[in-house]
């Protein structure tokens, strides 16, 4: 599998988990485990509205994906 495809798959996994309300540590760990299963050494950073996944190819080229997470089912204080 190509590195871009693996990175996109990991980013999509993290996006779906975050959008579904998963805890941040679970998102980071799941994406990390998925990509390390393919022999990669990823760096994963997640905050409630953003996911960043990065890795270096064996040739030393960095590849990074960032995905913004729109507001997703959190409590809105405007309606209280």
Which role fits each region the language model picked out?
Residues 4, 8-10, 14-22:
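Short Lys/Arg-enriched alpha/beta "domain-start" segment
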Residues 21-22, 72, 76:
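Ordered, soluble secondary-structure elements with a strong preference for glycine-centered loop motifs
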Residues 22-48, 66:
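Divalent-cation
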Residues 50-54:
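Polyanion/phosphate-binding surface patch
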Residues 56-61:
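Short acidic-glycine loop/turn motifs at beta-strand connectors
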Residues 62-74:
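Active-site cofactor/substrate anionic-group-binding motifs, chiefly glycine-
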Residues 78-80:
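Conserved small/polar residues in nucleotide/adenosyl-binding loops
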